[in-house]
């Protein structure tokens, strides 16, 4: 809700739609006109709808996605992609490609049920995607009146800077700050980070180091930092660490495990893919097997992301 509410304010303030076709941002790129089911959802997310039937036996459906230059992360699967190309993406019935660019900051909350959604949240869940600098300005108001037209609102700037180490900053709230809680609980998730970065985390509130809960989620490969602070304070989270790999072997296993294809073929594919061969050699061998085109395509998405 915080992200969506901020984007709705952007629509009001800047006359920009919440959903924008790709050619709005890239009017001179031919690919932007070819992906009719792909769009930007606000300024932090890119979405590709899946409108093709599920592939029988593979339990996934395909959609062609154009990735502009840069690094992109699927916020649901965690897969990291190199941009500047077209990619066939395969998804199960419960998922579609929703991508954040490197440097993206996605602000959400768990307070979305009943009357919770009527007030500004006391806790925020923030996802940060590494690989580039990025920023986001959170917007809040009284959620009831049109007083925002006269400036009755609050802005909270957030930014992520990456050089020798990553520094994520939540700046002090600005504006009519009585509209928001005086104190907030922040859960900041640094997505696609290697576990080694967990030991380097340092949290500062108004420049003073403070205690925070730090944990690592292995499957999702993210460092989670939990800290409480006044909304009038500056919060900085500093960490050093490498971007995690794409867990290729695990993803291939999960895909083959759920696919309804012969066990002998599953085993042959898995043994080949996990044999440690260089990628060009591996792709050549897979191509020579004359696999079903969608089975080959689904494996290519994982192997070449």
Role assignments for model-derived ranges:
Residues 1-198, 207:
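Catalytic core of carbohydrate-active enzymes
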Residues 114-305:
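Beta-rich accessory regions
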């Amino acid at each position: 809700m915080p992200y969506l509410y901020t984007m709705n304010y952007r629509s009001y303030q800047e006359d920009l739609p919440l959903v924008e076709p790709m050619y709005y941002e890239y009017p001179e790129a031919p690919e932007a006109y070819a992906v009719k089911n792909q769009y930007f959802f606000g300024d932090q997310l890119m979405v590709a709808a899946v409108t093709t039937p599920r592939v029988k036996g593979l339990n996934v459906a395909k959609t062609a996605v154009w990735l502009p230059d840069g690094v992109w992360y699927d916020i649901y699967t965690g897969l990291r992609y190199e941009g500047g190309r077209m990619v066939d993406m395969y998804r199960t019935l419960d998922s579609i490609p929703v991508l954040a660019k490197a440097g993206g900051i996605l602000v959400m909350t768990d307070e979305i049920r009943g009357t919770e959604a009527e007030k500004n949240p006391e806790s925020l869940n923030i996802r940060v995607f590494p690989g580039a600098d990025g920023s986001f300005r959170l917007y809040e108001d009284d959620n009831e009146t049109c007083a925002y037209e006269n400036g009755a609102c609050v802005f909270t700037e957030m930014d992520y800077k990456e050089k020798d180490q990553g520094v994520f900053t939540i700046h002090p709230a600005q504006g009519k700050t009585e509209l928001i809680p005086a104190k907030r609980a922040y859960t900041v998730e640094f997505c696609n980070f290697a576990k080694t970065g967990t030991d380097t985390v340092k949290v500062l509130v108004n420049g003073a180091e403070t205690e925070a809960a730090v944990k690592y989620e292995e499957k999702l490969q993210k460092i989670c930092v939990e800290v409480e602070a006044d909304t009038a304070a500056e919060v900085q989270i500093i960490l050093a660490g490498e971007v995690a790999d794409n867990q290729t072997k695990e993803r291939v296993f999960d895909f083959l495990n759920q696919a309804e294809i012969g066990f002998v073929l599953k085993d042959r594919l898995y043994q080949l893919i996990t044999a440690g061969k260089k990628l060009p050699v591996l792709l050549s061998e897979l191509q020579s097997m004359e696999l079903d085109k969608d089975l080959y395509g689904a494996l290519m998405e994982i192997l070449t992301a």
